[in-house]
Structure formats: C-alpha cells, structure tokens
Amino acid sequence: MRIVLQKVSEASVTVGSAVVSQIKHGYMLLVGIGTDDKLEDIDKLSKKILTFRGFDDDAGYGWKRNISEVDGEILCVSQFTLMARTSKGTKPDFHLAQRGELANELYGQFMDKLKAGLGDDKVQNGVFGAMMSCKLTNEGPVTIIFDSKA
Amino acid sequence: MRIVLQKVSEASVTVGSAVVSQIKHGYMLLVGIGTDDKLEDIDKLSKKILTFRGFDDDAGYGWKRNISEVDGEILCVSQFTLMARTSKGTKPDFHLAQRGELANELYGQFMDKLKAGLGDDKVQNGVFGAMMSCKLTNEGPVTIIFDSKA
C-alpha cells in the first residue's frame, strides 16, 4: 500500500461539473492499494497518517503536531497508479495494483479507520473509479510518501 | 532521487503574493534529491520523465504518448521531504535528503536536461528553498512515483 500525502490549505474533488468533496487545511491523500495488501497494511498506514506530526507548533517549530491537534481535515482519493512499476520501458506496469471490488473494500476499511480516528465529518472521499479533477494547494510544498512495506 | 509526477490541466507556484511560474496541461513534478544521488540518477530520471507515455492517443487509449507528443509543459518544484523515512515513530527522518548547494546543483542539472529535451519555454521552476504555494489540478487523478534506485 502506498500513500502520497500533500499538506494543503484547500483541496477539492470535482466529477463532471459537480464538486463532490472539499476540505480546508489538512492533508490530501492519494492512496494506492497493492495486490499483496491486507488489513494489516491498512491498519499500519491509517495509524501512521493519524499520528504523523505534519504540522508546526505555535512557535513555528516543524513536525510537532498531528492532524487532530490542528483540527485539520483529510481528503482521500483512491489512486491505483501509485502502485505502477516504472523501471522498465516507457509505459507504467500496473500488475502490482489491486483493482475493482477487492481494492475498493480495503480502501473503504482505510477510510473507516481514518474516520474512527478523526471523526466522520473530518474525512472526505473522492468517487472510487470515477474520472476526477483534484484541485489542491500544496503549502510549502510538503509531500510525503508512505509505503506499508517500507 | 524520487519524483512524484502529477498529470495536470493547470499548475502554478506562488511565493508571497506573486505567481512565479505557471503551466497549462502537462506534468507537475515534485523532485527529491538524496544524499547518495549522482549525475547518473539525474540522467536516468530525466530520460524517464521525457519518454514516459503518460497521455492517451486520439482514440482515447491510455499510456500512448509522451509529454512532447502532446505539446505539454512541465512545472518542477524541489521537494526534499520526498526523501523522508517514515517507518519509525511519528516524525519524518530526513537524513537521506540532500540539502543546500549540493541538492540545488543536482536539481539544476535535472532542470537543464528537461529543458534540453522539451525546450526552455516548456519547463518552469519553483524557487529553490522558498516557501511556495503550489496550486494544481490533477486530472484523473494520475500520480506516479519514480525512484532512481528502483
């Protein structure tokens, strides 16, 4: 399982012409589920995201506070392309990306764990499998890669 | 060296209140340089980005055309946080991230290779080391992680 976390001041997902979800300050998460991922991968990375100290303290010292300590929100979007292998050739190889119902099930469990930790109203979702336009403002920028196998 | 590529319909970098760079359709690249990276890593990933078939063909089949074949642009931003190790604890460990002049030099060489391949006017940059607001619209979304050590 891989996650690209971007620290945002705002982020939204639009499908067609409808804004389906939006947050103010917090994390935009792009989430890739792999063919060999299980509940323990979901467990590991949901804990990691909720406890990750991605925010400064009041004195401006970095990496001090986590998402709930700054009353932040999370916008989560499923992104199988994160599991691409790119070392050979010019086309991405997606054999390690879990797809369809299996991916959606694990992704749903990941969302449930984030909501359990942060509160339902603080965790937004894209539309699994839809063509989405993800608008965001990455402040810093701050972008962190999490990998459950690392 | 790590790159997070996001396929965008627009992207810009603002420092303070000034928009310092912006592109329309193409790639937003967040680029992390590691302490053990050399020119060969720069060479490898610049070739990979320029030849990567991230775009559909006219019939809508995916992964067929590269950035120059679709007359796309690249907005590149230095992002040392991509080299963070996150497996232990709740704070990112940046010991593997190259910093300062050494990072800036390799990053500059990476930019030069992209420009040589795509044309100077098609490759934009952030401001190395500055606090930047990176606005983007990731279409799909499509996000790919490239790692020169993979």
UniProtKB/Swiss-Prot annotation, chains A, B:
It is an enzyme of class 3 (hydrolase). InterPro entries: Daa-tRNA_deacyls_DTD, DTD-like_sf. Its main location: cytoplasm. The keyword Hydrolase applies. It is found in: Cytoplasm. GO terms for molecular function: D-tyrosyl-tRNA(Tyr) deacylase activity; tRNA binding. Keywords: Cytoplasm, Hydrolase, RNA-binding, tRNA-binding. A motif (Gly-cisPro motif, important for rejection of L-amino acids) lies at residues 140-141. Transmembrane segments: none annotated. GO terms for cellular component: cytoplasm. It comes from the Eukaryota. It catalyses: glycyl-tRNA(Ala) + H2O = tRNA(Ala) + glycine + H(+); a D-aminoacyl-tRNA + H2O = a tRNA + a D-alpha-amino acid + H(+). Its EC number is 3.1.1.96. The keyword RNA-binding applies. SUPFAM superfamilies: DTD-like (SSF69500). Belongs to the DTD family. A Gly-cisPro motif from one monomer fits into the active site of the other monomer to allow specific chiral rejection of L-amino acids. An aminoacyl-tRNA editing enzyme that deacylates mischarged D-aminoacyl-tRNAs. Also deacylates mischarged glycyl-tRNA(Ala), protecting cells against glycine mischarging by AlaRS. Acts via tRNA-based rather than protein-based catalysis; rejects L-amino acids rather than detecting D-amino acids in the active site. By recycling D-aminoacyl-tRNA to D-amino acids and free tRNA molecules, this enzyme counteracts the toxicity associated with the formation of D-aminoacyl-tRNA entities in vivo and helps enforce protein L-homochirality. PANTHER family: D-AMINOACYL-TRNA DEACYLASE 1 (PTHR10472:SF5), D-TYROSYL-TRNA TYR DEACYLASE (PTHR10472). Homodimer. This is D-aminoacyl-tRNA deacylase. It comes from Kluyveromyces lactis (strain ATCC 8585 / CBS 2359 / DSM 70799 / NBRC 1267 / NRRL Y-1140 / WM37).
